[in-house]
Curated annotation (Swiss-Prot):
Residue ranges, annotated region (Adenylyl removase): 1-527
Source organism, top-level taxon: Bacteria
This enzyme's EC code(s): 2.7.7.89, 2.7.7.42
Protein name from the UniProt record: Bifunctional glutamine synthetase adenylyltransferase/adenylyl-removing enzyme
Entry keyword set: ATP-binding, Magnesium, Multifunctional enzyme, Nucleotide-binding, Nucleotidyltransferase, Transferase
Protein family: Belongs to the GlnE family.
Lineage of source species: Bacteria, Bacillati, Actinomycetota, Actinomycetes, Mycobacteriales
Gene name of the record: glnE
GO BP, sorted A to Z: regulation of glutamine family amino acid metabolic process
GO MF assignments: [glutamate-ammonia-ligase] adenylyltransferase activity; [glutamine synthetase]-adenylyl-L-tyrosine phosphorylase activity; ATP binding; magnesium ion binding
Known catalytic reactions: [glutamine synthetase]-O(4)-(5'-adenylyl)-L-tyrosine + phosphate = [glutamine synthetase]-L-tyrosine + ADP; [glutamine synthetase]-L-tyrosine + ATP = [glutamine synthetase]-O(4)-(5'-adenylyl)-L-tyrosine + diphosphate
Pfam families linked: GlnD_UR_UTase (PF08335), GlnE (PF03710)
InterPro entries (UniProt xref): GlnE (IPR023057), GlnE_rpt_dom (IPR005190), NT_sf (IPR043519), PII_UdlTrfase/GS_AdlTrfase (IPR013546)
Top EC class for this record: transferase
Role played: Involved in the regulation of glutamine synthetase GlnA, a key enzyme in the process to assimilate ammonia. When cellular nitrogen levels are high, the C-terminal adenylyl transferase (AT) inactivates GlnA by covalent transfer of an adenylyl group from ATP to specific tyrosine residue of GlnA, thus reducing its activity. Conversely, when nitrogen levels are low, the N-terminal adenylyl removase (AR) activates GlnA by removing the adenylyl group by phosphorolysis, increasing its activity.
């Protein structure tokens, strides 16, 4: 038997390919393999090149540009190509700079391809200031100009024969050729700066070594020096164009402003300049205009809009003319802009005289009355100019962006620089360092902000370099390719846990949150350190410096505010320490309200009232939303503040539950039941009313807080307030009846049933915070009781209830008004149903019938209330409708109201009740239409103005546009009227004139308090449209002048 069959296999050993796959090199192009082979890099000898290429911001773009660069060199000669190939294999620094540059900026790469031999410049160090001046001035064959200025002996030219300084030069190359060579030279120098900068964020790992990091301040200084040299060269060409071979007869100084002035310039940015000359004549003006033209065509946009009077002002002024303008006319923002002013080129001595002369005006600008509001308005205008959908992508102008840091730092400089001259520095980063060193900002906070600011500037630089284009806009979140490029070009690397883009986005979120808490870090925490040391390394502001800072932050009475801080946070108690930790954030929130002073005082009162409540500070510490909502209330509404201070436990309702805000967790009907149930437990009517007041106080605080925090609509507010009044009236009536029955000297059984009929806004469930309760009382004798006895007993009950409710207390008043009853104030307080019917049949006047349109049962005996309403329906909704005589009477009375009821001195345009297009206009229009059509449309048997408007639209009585106009005006005027009570603590109908009081009303109406002018304009626009509809519908005419009675 033969042996088992055996198969023989040839074992081949596995040898790993030493060359990385294109995917491992972060290359995604389908041509990548072929391109690497074309370069001759798909071999072991080229591993350093392959791994080096993989570190580029965008390896595919870098590879594409390398192919083009090699081809451009091949066109020169094979030796030119081989020289570059050999150099990048041997010179690691060159390799890193070249790959970082090509992968970080396709535009600069294009310049290199167009000028292929310039790769050799990447072997050099970044250009020095002197080298930049020499390169640009040599490009136009410049030489020092002759300066001969009459009547100005201080004229001085610091130009040198070696072309290494600013000053007056004259160019031999002019015209289009000058612009061409200047542009080429500028781009070449920019390429060298960018190569070193990009190499600084080229990643280092085990396979490749990165470049030396270049500090942010070094890059921005180099770019600013380049701008100085560029405009010096442009000035040389301008002088040649204007003066030819003649001496320069005017000392012209170019003052750099903005980022260039501060020597913190971007790669691509407008360069802001101002011109000062002695004398400021036609030739100096032509020279300045030529400099702007040449500079803008060759380098970057040169902008002179920061000069006095802006673009409409003279381009060139003398020093005296500048001084006269700034002393008399300049606005706050113009002094803020001067913080960055720096002599750039031309007559440097004259430029320094300009800076020295204006310096005192800069440092006293913070004493101007409008300083704080001006600075806040400037920042708000910047934000408003950013479209909402771009704010998260906007590095410069969005929230948590560069401008937030710059504005805040400049504000601190202007506040404290008046006294502390060390703060008189130009650059943002240098100013932050000084603020830290001098103790105005905590060391850790300051250094974190510097890092955050420099990181955002790094992203800004990378975005601008990519296409040599001015931009501050991040790629869209779903643009993963560009997000990846930006992250890699900025030095982020991927890992197993997250990609480079995710790492960058995560860090960016952290940075923005840090900057958004800027005011707390820069302004409020140092303030608290002046009262109590929050940390061992924090240097305390002196009391005077702290008060200066409080004034700059919008506190009108900084000494009092400082006193409040001291009372709250000083001392060694645990409460004081917690207050010291909380107050920086709380004060930041207060600063966004209409009255920070009042808000801080209210917070101190509330803290005193809550002293024995251990949960108070703990809740503020642990539930940030409570503190934020509380500060908004305390700084905007004295009305709610008083309610909360008298009921501190209410604060617990400012937090959130699992289902949402606790303020909305309680239904108004539950509150009604609670008031009635609580009152029923008290035998004494005084205690019963006291209990009702307490519950009403809490409910008013809940409604008003939810209203101020924009959690309730105007309709929901009015309905909730009406339900509270209904409950109080019902509970009070019940308490009075029980007290009367318990009085041994009075009957022990009720002699009548009593019902309370709501009139006016109470009847329509449209009460405001300051509204009285307009009511009528109706009674019905119980079986076996004479009518006069029942009425007498009912009058005693109702009178007692009204008196008890009206007793003075610390709560908002409870006034019950009977002015709409038959015969007005001289009529009987209580009537039976029959008595009411007889009165209306025999003596009822048109205005009384009109008033019945709002009658609704609100409290007491429900059946009796319904019976009363049914009995008056024939008067208010007559079968054949209102007569023409009644309609004329309504219009006649309305005309008298318009002419006679408006209080003396009131403004008809802004009176929320009796003003043009305001509440009375709208409600009378709706009531007139109800009287005209209710007999045909039963749905109009409704006491609510807004609901009746819906019915009128549904049945096409008036058109939808008219209905919407009246509805919007009613809601706007009602909201304004409610806001007036919230901010003034009492019923007012007249909007304040523009200023702080109107800012409060705007804030309470859900607007930014600083936008009070826009709020007023909106109110006027809405009510003006409403008045037009009233004229058309109520009066039936096109203008007020056509009415006759």
């Amino acid at each position: 038997m033969s042996g088992p069959l055996r198969s023989e296999r040839k074992v081949v050993g596995f040898v790993r390919d030493p060359l990385p796959k294109v995917g491992s090199l972060s290359l995604k192009s389908e041509h990548a393999q072929a391109d690497l082979e074309h370069l001759g890099w798909r071999n072991v000898e080229s591993l350093d090149l392959l791994w080096g290429l993989s570190g580029a911001g965008d390896p595919d773009v870098a590879l594409n540009l390398l192919i083009r660069l090699y081809q451009a060199l091949e066109a020169i000669g094979e030796d030119a190509r081989n020289e570059l190939d050999q150099e990048i294999r041997q010179d690691e620094k060159l390799r890193v700079r070249l790959f970082a540059l090509l992968g970080g900026s396709s535009a600069v790469g294009d310049h290199l391809v167009a000028n292929p031999l310039q790769w050799k410049l990447l072997k050099l160090d970044a250009p020095s200031r002197e080298e930049m001046f020499q390169a640009l001035l040599e490009s136009v064959k410049a030489q020092p100009a002759v300066l001969e200025v009459e009547d100005f002996s201080d004229a001085h030219n610091i130009a040198r024969d070696d072309l290494s300084t600013p000053g007056f030069y004259t160019a031999s190359v002019t015209g289009p050729e000058a612009e061409r060579v200047l542009k080429w030279t500028y781009r070449t120098l920019l390429t060298r700066i960018a190569a070193h900068d990009l190499a600084g964020t080229y990643p280092t790992d085990m396979r490749r070594k990165g470049g030396d990091p270049v500090p942010f301040s070094t890059v921005t200084m180099q770019l600013s020096d380049l701008a100085d040299a560029a405009l010096t060269a442009a000035l040389a060409v301008a002088i040649a164009n204007v003066y030819g071979e003649k001496p320069v007869d005017s000392a012209l100084s170019v003052i750099a402003m903005g980022k260039c002035g501060a020597q913190e310039l971007n790669y691509i940015s407008d360069v802001d300049v101002v011109f000062v000359a002695e004398p400021a004549n036609s030739k100096s003006t032509r020279t300045a205009a030529e400099l702007i033209r040449i500079g803008s065509n060759s380098f970057f946009e040169v902008d002179a809009a920061l000069r006095p009077e802006g673009k409409s002002g003279a381009l060139v002024r003398s020093l005296d003319s500048h001084m006269a303008y700034y002393k008399r006319w300049a606005e706050t923002w113009e002094f803020q802009a001067l913080l960055k002013a720096r002599p750039m080129t031309g007559d440097i001595n004259l430029g320094q005289s300009y800076v020295d002369a204006l310096s005192p005006l800069i440092w006293t600008a913070s004493q101007r009355e409008s300083f704080v509001t001006d600075v806040q308005a400037m920042r708000r205008r910047v934000l408003d100019n950013v479209p909402e959908d771009l704010r998260d992508r906007e590095l410069k102008l969005g929230r948590g962006g560069l401008r937030d840091v710059e504005f805040a730092v400049q504000l601190l400089q202007m506040v404290h620089g008046r006294i502390d001259e060390t703060l008189r520095v130009r650059s943002t980063v240098n100013a932050l360092h000084v603020l830290v060193d001098q103790g105005y900002v905590g060391r850790e906070d300051g250094h974190n902000l510097i890092e955050s600011y420099e990181f955002l500037r790094l992203l800004e630089h990378r975005l601008q370099l990519e296409r040599i284009k001015r931009t501050h806009l991040l790629p869209k979140p779903d643009d993963r390719m560009n997000m990846r490029w930006l992250a890699r070009a900025s030095g982020f690397t991927g890992s197993m846990e997250q990609s480079s883009a995710k790492a960058m986005e995560r860090h960016l979120r952290k940075v923005r949150l840090q900057i958004q808490s800027l005011h707390s870090q820069l302004f409020y925490r140092p303030l608290l350190n002046s009262v109590v040391n929050l940390s061992a390394d924090a240097i305390r502001l002196s009391p005077d410096a702290a008060k200066l800072q409080l004034a700059a932050l919008g506190y009108l009475h900084p000494s009092r505010a400082y006193e409040h801080l001291t009372a709250l946070a000083s001392g060694a108690s645990r409460k004081a320490k917690i207050q010291a930790m909380l107050l920086p954030t709380l004060m930041e929130w207060l600063s966004q309200t209409a009255e920070p002073d009042a808000g801080l005082l209210n917070y101190r009162k509330l803290s005193d009232a809550s002293y024995d409540r251990s949960w108070f500070l703990r809740m503020l510490r642990d539930e940030g939303v409570v503190g934020q909502r509380l500060m908004r209330i305390l700084g905007n509404s004295p009305y709610i503040s008083e309610l909360i201070i008298s009921t501190p436990d209410f604060m617990k309702q400012l937090g959130d539950a699992a289902s949402g805000p606790k303020l909305l967790a309680t239904a108004p009907t539950q509150v009604v039941k609670a008031i009635k149930a609580t009152v029923s437990r008290h035998e004494s009517p005084d205690r019963a009313i006291q209990a009702a007041r307490s519950l009403r106080r809490q409910e008013l605080a809940r409604i008003a807080s939810a209203d101020l925090l924009n959690m309730l609509t105007v309709q929901e507010v009015c309905q909730s307030l009406s339900l509270v009044w209904d409950a109080v009236l019902d509970a009070a009536l019940d308490a009075e009846i029980r007290a009367a029955l318990n009085d041994p000297q009075k009957p022990d059984q009720p002699l009548a049933n009593i019902s309370v009929i709501g009139m006016g806004r109470l009847g329509g469930a449209e009460l405001g915070y300051g509204s009285d309760a307009d009511v009528m009382f109706v009674c019905e004798p119980v079986a076996g009781v004479e009518e006069h006895e029942a009425v007498t007993w009912s009058i005693a009950i109702c009178d007692s209830m009204r008196s008890r409710l009206a007793q003075p207390s610390g709560d908002p008043p409870l006034e019950v008004d009977l002015g709409l009853r038959p015969e007005g104030r001289s009529g009987a307080i209580v009537r039976t149903v029959d008595s009411y019917v007889k009165y209306y049949e025999k003596w009822g006047e048109t205005w009384e019938i009109q008033a019945l349109l709002r009658a609704a049962w609100v409290a007491g005996d429900r059946e009796l209330g319904i019976k009363f309403l049914e009995s008056i329906d024939r008067f208010r909704y007559p079968v054949d409708g209102a007569t023409q005589a009644q309609l004329r009477e309504v219009r006649r009375i309305k005309a008298r109201v318009d002419n006679e009821r408006l209080p003396r001195g009131a403004d008809r345009n802004t009176h929320t009740k009796l003003g043009r297009g305001a509440l009375t206009d709208i409600e009378w229009t709706v009531q007139l239409l109800t009287m005209m059509h209710a007999h045909e449309i039963p749905e109009l048997h409704n006491t609510s103005t807004l609901e009746v408007l819906e019915v009128l639209e549904k049945h096409q009585i008036i058109n939808p546009v008219q209905v919407q106009t009246l509805r919007e005006a009613w809601l706007t005027a009602t909201a304004a009227r409610n806001a007036l009570v919230l901010v003034r603590g009492k019923r007012l109908d007249q909007l304040p004139t523009p200023g702080p009081h109107l800012a409060q009303v705007a804030g309470a109406s859900g607007w930014d308090p600083n936008e009070y002018q826009e709020y007023l304009e909106n109110y006027l626009k809405v009510t003006r449209k409403s008045r037009q509809v009233v004229d058309e519908v109520f009066w039936g005419v096109d203008s007020m002048e056509q009415r006759e009675f």
